[in-house]
């Protein structure tokens, strides 16, 4: 598989295995830009502590595939909170959280669940900020102005307060 997508071996590849019906997590990083200092694999999160060769600093990338079923969401939220709290370097959290944060994320009117409230509280307590996708239409939006959020295509990105100084072009607040 990797020979087809990376025939020149320019990427570090790390993955978390699939669990039950949930897919796994695959993350590739360009070797010219990053060294992987540490890998931590949770049930829902693959954390890579990186050395950024261009910025000459370390930061963590946490790739998420959140629990799809309500009975597992508390475990996912606890893992997210624990991994973020234990990081002693700036971090970026991105992936499919499988939790609707705001009612505007769906094309249908739905009320927010208890998990949405808990998830938003954790994000607030951790001081995370969301990077909103802007610009042109996306392939999953059916070329419409507004995004259609479907659990298998959603990608959200949250930043710890310390990392925005490393990635100034991605955000402004």
Task: Name the predicted role of every residue range.
Residues 1-173:
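A shared catalytic/ligand-binding motif for oxyanion handling
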């Amino acid at each position: 598989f990797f020979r087809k997508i990376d025939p020149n071996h320019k990427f570090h590849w790390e993955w978390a295995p699939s669990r039950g019906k949930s897919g796994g997590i695959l993350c590739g990083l360009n070797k010219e830009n990053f060294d992987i200092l540490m890998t931590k694999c949770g049930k829902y999160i693959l954390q890579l502590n990186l050395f950024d060769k261009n910025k000459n600093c370390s930061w963590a990338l946490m790739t998420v595939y959140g629990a799809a079923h309500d009975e597992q969401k508390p475990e996912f939220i606890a893992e997210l909170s624990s991994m973020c709290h234990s990081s002693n370097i700036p971090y970026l959290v991105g992936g499919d959280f499988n939790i609707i944060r705001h009612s505007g994320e769906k094309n249908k009117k739905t009320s927010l669940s208890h998990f949405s409230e808990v998830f938003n509280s954790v994000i607030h307590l951790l001081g995370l900020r969301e990077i909103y996708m802007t610009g042109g239409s996306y392939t999953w939006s059916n070329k419409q102005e507004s995004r259609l959020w479907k659990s298998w295509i959603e990608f959200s990105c949250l930043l710890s307060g310390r990392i925005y100084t490393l990635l100034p072009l991605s955000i402004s607040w």
